[in-house]
Swiss-Prot record:
Positions bearing the site annotation: Important for tRNA non-discrimination: 30, 81
The protein, known as: Aspartate--tRNA(Asp/Asn) ligase
Enzyme category, top tier: ligase
Cited function: Aspartyl-tRNA synthetase with relaxed tRNA specificity since it is able to aspartylate not only its cognate tRNA(Asp) but also tRNA(Asn). Reaction proceeds in two steps: L-aspartate is first activated by ATP to form Asp-AMP and then transferred to the acceptor end of tRNA(Asp/Asn).
HAMAP family named in the record: Asp_tRNA_synth_type1 (MF_00044)
High-level lineage: Bacteria, Pseudomonadati, Pseudomonadota, Gammaproteobacteria, Oceanospirillales
Binding partners and assembly: Homodimer.
NCBIfam families in the cross-refs: aspS_bact (TIGR00459), PRK00476.1 (NF001750)
Residue stretches spanning the membrane: none
Gene Ontology MF: a single term: aspartate-tRNA(Asn) ligase activity
Length: 592
């Protein structure tokens, strides 16, 4: 039906006959001549229809925005003075010989060039219209280029693209599972996979050596800006590898991806231990573009007559940290109060601060309600953080976890608000993670997942599991975790030991993970891998604000699809066939 896409037209095609298909982006009538901007996925071309072609003119005259047209005509240069250098096809136009209306269109709920004035709910309800916007087409085209580049790289490295099951069994992997009732096994349920983790390990036991998959994953969890109930991973696993093998391979893959798709050469990927990342940045995924760091001042604060600081400084699980912001003394009290409210979100009880107006005057040159408690240590404090005139110092004092979360988040917010970024891209590897983290009740939970290998011997692990480090590694870019991986446990005894620490007894382990434990008895090779969040990767590379912008048909924050009204009710007959009976829905906010 067509010879070219609209965006392919240029001056080299002048005087050629072309056939175009697309949507009316805009229609204008100037002095009896009709101008149509015809749009397809590649761009927009200007079409001129004059009365000398009566049938074409009549069809163009009745065309409205979003009508679907087929145009045949000749390419010519635009008259001087009407050329548009800001438009890829702005030097030429198509003089139409034939205009065929392939389909009409109702008035859309919003105009494509006015989407910014329309709420996201309306756009998601009519996603098929929203996806016509060039910005959305560009993002999904970029997503396609990314997956193509990744596949080409991994295939070139000897990886096999192998699909793993979508219907599997529920296993405790951290989040809630999406459950699927079985009709043929009454009262029993499949679970949708939170990741292909166990299956890819079994593929290594099977001897496939190198596996990858662009995999759909499902997690029934509370949603945030960077989460969806169904999401996509670039998943890979390899046998007979150590951490350095996987890290080197995936770093090279990401470097080539950025070069191929964005023409960007990423800087070096430094390695940073987890403990250092938490101490210096308050986060295990620090944004190294922001030149702000947390500084420990516990030792200085232990003797001050200010219990808000001295208490946490003396506590085993406490921390007092300072965050110096160069030039931050210009912040108003209103702005500081707003930052105080911000850290409250992360559990901080307040946000102490000191403005350094004129350091040479000693304590008289400082502005703060707390300096009166620090006369004996103030010079040491200012030296410790490297304070100069015009700086502000923020403080966090509480349990170390709260201080890290609050000041870590404040650091990122200050970087955004004050535009402190020093470079466009800042990648790194975070390594040497703890195997476990303790919850509020002191129970241990796997920091990554229970199949991650510890970096110590089985004897050392059993002697002190709480302090064991793991063979895990996370790739971080601009404060976003791009991917996480580890060397896996390939020994059944060690796997049972990890389950035991997590409170998973032998009977429960056999019930839920018996297939994995059995497989580990039959010559499992050392293996490891990594999974990238494709949605996050595309979001970063495209500059999108949320991953909803880089998924064709995303869910809302409440895990619903506004376009299809999913999830929806099913008939009583369907439920009966599945041997399911629903409890009565809550009415008037009452209890179920």
């Amino acid at each position: 039906m067509r010879s070219h896409y609209c965006g392919q037209l240029n001056e080299t095609l002048v005087d050629e006959e072309v056939a175009l298909c697309g949507w009316v982006h805009r229609r204008r009538d100037h002095g009896g001549v009709i101008f149509l901007d015809l749009r397809d996925r590649d761009g927009i071309a200007q079409v001129v229809v004059d009365p000398d072609t009566p049938e074409a003119f009549a069809n163009a005259d009745r065309a409205r925005n979003e009508f679907v047209l087929r145009i045949r005509g000749r390419i010519r240069l635009r008259p001087e003075g009407t050329q548009n250098a800001h438009m890829p096809t702005g030097m030429i136009e198509v003089l139409a010989k034939d205009v065929e209306v392939l389909n009409t269109a109702a008035t859309p709920p919003f105009q494509l060039d006015e989407h910014g004035k329309v709420g996201e709910e309306i756009r998601l309800k009519h996603r098929y219209i929203d996806l016509r916007r060039p910005e959305m087409i560009d993002k999904l085209r970029l997503r396609s280029r990314i997956t193509h580049s990744v596949r080409a790289y991994l295939e070139g490295q000897g990886f096999l693209d192998i699909e793993t099951p979508i219907l599997t069994r529920a296993t405790p992997e951290g989040a809630r599972d999406y459950l699927v009732p079985s009709r043929t096994h009454a009262g029993e349920f499949f679970a949708l996979p939170q990741s292909p983790q166990l299956f890819k390990q079994l593929l290594m036991v099977s001897g496939f050596d190198r596996y990858y998959q662009i995999a759909k994953c499902f997690r029934d969890e509370d949603l945030r800006a960077d989460r969806q109930p169904e999401f996509t991973q670039i998943d890979l696993e390899a046998s007979f590898v150590e951490e350095s093998d996987i890290m080197s391979l995936t770093e090279d893959m990401i470097r080539r991806l950025f070069q191929d798709v964005l023409d960007v050469e990423l800087p070096a990927f430094p390695k940073m231990p987890y403990s250092e990342a938490m101490n210096r940045y308050g986060s295990d995924k620090p944004d190294l573009r922001i030149p702000l760091e947390l500084v420990d001042v516990d030792d200085l604060m232990q003797g001050v007559d200010f219990k808000v600081f001295s208490g946490p400084a003396k506590a085993d699980d406490g921390r007092v940290a300072a965050l110096k912001v160069t030039g931050g003394a210009t912040l108003s009290r209103k702005e500081i109060d707003a930052y105080t409210d911000f850290v409250n979100i992360y559990g901080a009880k307040g946000l102490a601060w000191i403005k350094v107006n004129e350091r040479a005057k000693g304590i008289q040159g400082l502005q703060s309600p707390i300096v009166k408690f620090m006369e004996d240590i103030i010079e040491s404090l200012l030296d410790r953080v490297g304070a100069e005139d015009g700086d502000i110092i923020f403080f966090g004092a509480d349990k170390a976890r709260i201080v890290n979360e609050a000041l870590g988040a404040l650091r990122v917010k200050l970087g955004e608000d004050l535009d402190l970024y020093t470079q466009a891209w800042a990648p790194l590897w975070v390594v040497d993670f703890p195997m476990f983290e303790a919850d509020d009740n002191g129970r241990l939970a796997a920091l990554h997942h229970p199949f991650t290998a510890p970096s110590c011997t089985p004897e050392a692990f059993k002697a002190d599991p709480a302090n064991a480090l793991s063979r895990a590694y996370d790739m971080v870019l601009n404060g976003t975790e791009l991917g996480g991986g580890s060397i896996r446990i390939h020994d059944q005894t060690m796997q049972r030991a990890v389950f035991e620490v997590l409170g998973i007894g032998e009977e429960e382990a056999d019930e839920k993970f018996g297939f994995l434990l059995d497989a580990l008895k039959f010559g499992a090779p050392p293996h490891g891998g990594l999974a990238f969040g494709l949605d996050r990767l595309v979001m970063l590379m495209s500059g999108a604000r949320t991953i909803r912008e880089v998924i064709a048909f995303p869910k809302t924050q409440s895990a619903a699809c506004l376009m299809t009204d999913a999830p929806g009710e099913v008939s009583a007959e369907q439920l009966k066939e599945l041997n399911i009976r629903l409890r009565q829905k809550a009415q008037n906010n009452g209890d179920v």
